[in-house]
Amino acid sequence: AGEQLPGVINVSARALASHALSIFGDHSDVMACRQTGCAMLCESSVQEVMDLTPVAHLAAIKGKVPFINFFDGFRTSHEIQKIETWDYEDLKDMADMEAIQAFRDHALNPNHPCQRGSAQNPDIFFQAREACNPFYDALPAVVQEYMDKVNEKIGTDYKLFNYYGAEDAEHIIIAMGSVNDTIEETIDYLTAAGKKVGVVKVRLYRPFCAQAL
């Protein structure tokens, strides 16, 4: 992240061992990565993993920020589900070839040498660290741009945050991961009974774009 190199780590999120070992899914492992500088994109279902993983890859290249693309361990990672798969030509159509070429040109090459891995004093180090903030500020728009391209191709409605429920909800859950499918079914039941409830499904967790809520 510090060198603004794109990359995607796909993570089936699981619990960190504490008083006992647990290999089931919570988000304690990926939560430990919040301050690494990686963007974090979360999916709620197997179909969403298929649809949004390309968004992580394409946004990483164009936005120059690495991604942790995560989904719930076992509940999503090992679920057997019928899904619609992508054609590689469709993915190719969405790729920003200029951004890909710029990434390739950034590789170490004796024809255009560059300096990396320097040691800096505090007066320079903090300025250089702050200089990367515009890339993080711009990243939510890049992610939404690719979500829009996915939506256009397959008829979905992916956003940084998706709302589901009553328009005049009095109680709202904010959730991330496979629990959203269960929450949606519960909301259908409760709204049918006259309850005013809803859920905000978080997809882009880092950088968190409050303006998109």
Feature locations, PLM:
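A glycine-rich helix N-cap at a beta->alpha junction
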Residues: E3-A13, L91-A99
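Acidic, glycine-rich active-site loops and adjacent beta-strand->loop/helix elements
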Residues: A1, V11-S18, V46-Q47, G73-R75, ...
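Conformationally flexible catalytic loops at phosphate/diphosphate-handling active centers
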Residues: F67-N162
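Short coil/turn connectors at secondary-structure junctions
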Residues: G2-V8, H27-S28, Q35-C38, K62-P66, ...
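Short acidic, glycine/serine/threonine-rich loops at helix termini
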Residues: S18-F24, D51-P54, H78-T85, E185
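Thiamine diphosphate
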Residues: S18-A20, C33, Q144-L213
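Conserved thiamine diphosphate
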Residues: L21-G73, M97
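Short, solvent-exposed amphipathic alpha-helical segments in soluble enzyme
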Residues: G2, P54-A59, E84-D87, E185-G194
